[in-house]
Amino acid sequence: MINTNPKRSNEPPVWLLFSAGGMISALAFPVLILILGILLPLGIISPDGIIAFAHHWFGKLVILVLTIFPAWAGLHRIHHGMHDIKVHVPSGGLIFYGLAVLYTVVAIWGVASI
């Protein structure tokens, strides 16, 4: 018999944000460490170029992508990691994903004010 009222899950959109954050972290953070941690202190790259990039609309988009998606990945990992170690927080999904949404809003506001 076919269930005409299937239960919907919020997991697919959350897994999309989680996987995007993991991929961005793996690919972009080594480059950021190279640029901000090595090339900038050695004087190979000027801070003026980085500031100009951050003020451009594309730079703001890059900053948002590099902050929002890894935050979703981290909070998703914490949420599921707590389940793995048998620490069940009441309304854990609401708390952790709510924090991710709050962080997203704060990040958008912060980057928009640059």
Swiss-Prot record:
It comes from the Bacteria. The chain crosses the membrane at residues 24-44, 49-69, 94-114. It is found in: Cell inner membrane. GO terms for cellular component: fumarate reductase complex; plasma membrane. One of its GO terms (molecular function) is succinate dehydrogenase activity. It is a multi-pass membrane protein. It holds the Pfam family Fumarate_red_D. Keywords: Cell inner membrane, Cell membrane, Membrane, Transmembrane, Transmembrane helix. Its main location: membrane. GO terms for biological process: fumarate metabolic process. InterPro entries: Fumarate_red_D, SQR/QFR_C/D. Part of an enzyme complex containing four subunits: a flavoprotein (FrdA), an iron-sulfur protein (FrdB), and two hydrophobic anchor proteins (FrdC and FrdD). Anchors the catalytic components of the fumarate reductase complex to the cell membrane, binds quinones. HAMAP family: Fumarate_red_D. Belongs to the FrdD family. This is Fumarate reductase subunit D. It comes from Actinobacillus succinogenes (strain ATCC 55618 / DSM 22257 / CCUG 43843 / 130Z). The gene is frdD.
